[in-house]
Curated annotation (Swiss-Prot):
SUPFAM superfamilies associated with the record: Ribosomal protein L13
Record-given protein name: Large ribosomal subunit protein uL13
Keywords annotated in UniProt: Ribonucleoprotein, Ribosomal protein
Transmembrane annotation, as ranges: none
Subunit structure: Part of the 50S ribosomal subunit.
Domain of life: Bacteria
NCBIfam families assigned: rplM_bact
The protein's role, per its UniProt record: This protein is one of the early assembly proteins of the 50S ribosomal subunit, although it is not seen to bind rRNA by itself. It is important during the early stages of 50S assembly.
HAMAP family referenced in this protein's UniProt entry, alphabetically: Ribosomal_uL13
UniProt record similarity statement: Belongs to the universal ribosomal protein uL13 family.
Length: 145
């Protein structure tokens, strides 16, 4: 009887990838990055094991949104105090917190639970084209499409 080889923590090789967000659409970039973080691009993908690679996103402030989403899309958060519901438009988020905007989009596409939280820790988002991970020798990743 033959068995399918299953990945486990000891036999996973992780790469560091750099993705440039300049001029890319938020949703299209987020889906592909979420897939890389999960490890679905690898033939060794195993649903119950974190097989994904580390992803560094640069130029987060240059992300694009289609249509009127910059003015119409609203991000909500709550301060946990009575009457503490706060809101920001996508334009305010992109101007002041572009890293958070990308992180929220990608986090929503990852599994909910401890495995998803572990995958999310491999995401690094930065404003501008500089990042502090040169020591890991990251490879440039070109998005499909």
């Amino acid at each position: 009887m033959r068995t399918t080889p299953m990945a486990n923590a000891s036999n996973i090789e992780r790469k560091w990838l750099v993705v440039d967000a300049a001029g890319k659409t938020l949703g299209r970039l987020s889906t592909e990055v979420a897939s890389i973080l999960r490890g679905k691009h690898k033939p060794t993908y195993t649903p119950h094991v974190d097989t994904g690679d580390h992803v560094i996103i640069i130029n987060a402030e240059k992300i694009e949104l289609t249509g009127k989403k910059l003015t119409d899309k609203i991000y909500y958060r709550h301060t946990q105090h009575p009457g503490g519901l706060k809101s920001r438009t996508a334009l305010e988020m992109r101007t002041n917190y572009p890293e958070k905007m990308l992180e929220l989009a990608i986090k929503g596409m990852l599994p909910k639970g401890s495995l998803g939280r572990q995958m999310f820790k491999k995401l690094n988002v930065y404003r501008g084209s500089e990042h502090p991970h040169q020591a890991q020798k990251p490879e440039v990743y070109e998005l499909r499409g």
